[in-house]
Amino acid sequence: MTINTSFFSLQGSLETDKEELFSNIKINIKYNKWTTIIGQSGTGKSTLLKIIANLNIANTFLNNISADTNKNYSFSWMAQNDLLLPWSNILNNVMLGQKLRREKLDVNRALNLLEKVGLLNVAYQLPSTLSGGMRQRVALARTLMENNDIILMDEPFSSLDSITKSKIQELTWKLFKNKTVVMVTHDPLEAVLLSNELFYITNKQLKPIKLPESKPIRKITSSNLLHSHEYILNLLKNSYIPS
């Protein structure tokens, strides 16, 4: 599906039966760009993704946030857990969406994607035989297999060690380049490395953060990147409210 407009908007308020979570927020999310929302745990990052995806949130929420994404747009969701079916081999996990929809399986496309993520040689193995980083690459291939309009990422790299995380971040960015991505994270460095647009949650609002002029994926040795990382870290520290 071709997306003709340049952005979609997310605006409104959200409250639980106990407190207000967001108050009159407004954010424009650009198509074909990587947008990141950063914030402390419990600030509603994942809830925003659910609203964007037109998912029903718990009835304990009073929600008047509207996302003006067309209802016909399709979404992929990549979570911090790989969510692979343990009894199904890697190839079948990549084709899971087609299986559930009872569509004709595109085995060649699935194998091609496994080759892109460097896992063609384990296509017929079970997930239990793979490392955490390899499993997340399978999840990446499965996300690409769906070829949806908008990719929503809920802290997808948070369970990985530093070296594995760096490698998969770079691979993910290369494969998702020029796609519409909305990611939530609590990692300032990750946000600066990958994002075209960046917002942080503070005082029930979403505020934009200026990023270095260089384009992602940015070099970790860049002085501008390190300065931005320190700046965002301080923002998060100042907005932190102990539970």
Language-model regions, residue ranges each:
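Helix-to-loop junction immediately C-terminal to a conserved catalytic motif
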Residues: 53
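ABC-type ATPase nucleotide-binding domains, specifically the catalytic core motifs of the NBD
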Residues: 57, 88, 92-107, 116
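Conserved ABC nucleotide-binding domain
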Residues: 113-129
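Hydrophobic anchor residue at the start of the ABC signature
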Residues: 140-141
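A short, proline-enriched helix->beta-strand linker immediately N-terminal to the Walker B motif
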Residues: 145-149
